[in-house]
Design a protein with these regions (language model features):
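Basic/polar N-terminal segments that are highly enriched at the extreme N-terminus
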Residues: 1-6, 10, 218-224
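Short alpha-helical hairpin
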Residues: 9-34, 52, 177-186
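Alpha-helical bundle segments that constitute or directly flank the non-heme di-iron/ferroxidase center
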Residues: 13-18, 33-62, 82, 131-141, ...
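Amphipathic, well-ordered alpha-helical segments in soluble domains
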Residues: 20-21, 48-55, 82-86, 109-113, ...
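Active-site-proximal alpha-helical scaffolds that flank and shape metal-associated catalytic sites
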Residues: 67-171, 200
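Long amphipathic all-alpha helical oligomerization modules
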Residues: 169-200
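Acidic, carboxylate-rich catalytic segments that either coordinate divalent cations
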Residues: 196-224
Length: 224
């Protein structure tokens, strides 16, 4: 039986394939990505992950299902204890300071992506917001699985790849997929279409995120 997320996966494939094959990922696996570009990516991702974690708690506040609430609460805490902690290890290796973090402007694409997810919740529904969060989980897992066999000659990049191919991370992805299917079963056809729309938009923002990082996007880019 084809599930709701099976349908999402099929619809998003053109965008996801572009992400897997994006020059950012290709250069990272080849060990050719400038460290300044990875540094830029990490600084932007710190903002993104912080808001991503908050959204887990905010969505949980609007749900009634105990299992769903528990997963989202643990997801929010896991981001603090796990993925964000990994990023902190990267920051230490790259000598990224708290002052540098505080002074780094949020790039337009990162800003808009986060606002898109908040809009899915506050101008939409918790089910829609769950669907908007799913591509970040799922796409990174697919990228990790796609490039793990090749790896990267740069140890920092190899650590990044291994984060998203780990058994623990894959388990979280599978739980998020199950939660999205559950959410889809609770709403009508019109709302499932809205869930589909935000999923595709999040997938497009994921693709834009690589390009943002490669170009070191800033707000001046909007006026050029």
């Amino acid at each position: 039986m084809t599930t709701f997320t099976d349908q999402l996966h099929e619809l998003a494939q053109p965008l996801w394939l572009q992400s897997v094959n994006h020059p950012f990922i290709k250069q990272l696996t080849a060990g050719e990505l400038p460290m300044s570009t990875f540094r830029y990516y990490l600084l932007q991702d710190r903002y993104y992950l912080s808001e991503f974690g908050k959204l887990h708690d905010l969505i949980a506040d609007q749900l009634d299902d105990p299992a769903a609430i528990d997963f989202l609460r643990k997801g929010a805490q896991g981001l603090k204890n796990g993925e964000i902690a990994v990023r902190k290890g990267f920051f230490t290796q790259l000598n990224i300071t708290k002052n540098e973090i505080a002074l780094t402007p949020i790039a337009p694409t990162a800003y808009n992506y986060v606002n898109h997810m908040y809009a899915a919740l506050y101008r939409g529904t918790p089910q829609r917001a769950i669907s908007a969060l799913l591509p970040c989980y799922w796409l990174y897992n697919e990228i990790g699985k796609a490039v793990i066999s090749q790896g990267s000659p740069v140890s920092l990049y190899q650590q990044w790849i291994e984060t998203y191919d780990s058994e623990g991370y894959t388990d979280s992805v599978n739980q998020m997929i199950q939660l999205t299917n559950l959410a889809a079963s609770q709403v009508d056809k019109a709302e499932r279409q809205q869930m589909t729309d935000v999923f595709i938009k999040s997938s497009a923002y994921e693709l834009g995120y690589w390009q943002m990082s490669l170009k070191h996007e800033d707000w001046d880019a909007l006026t050029k």
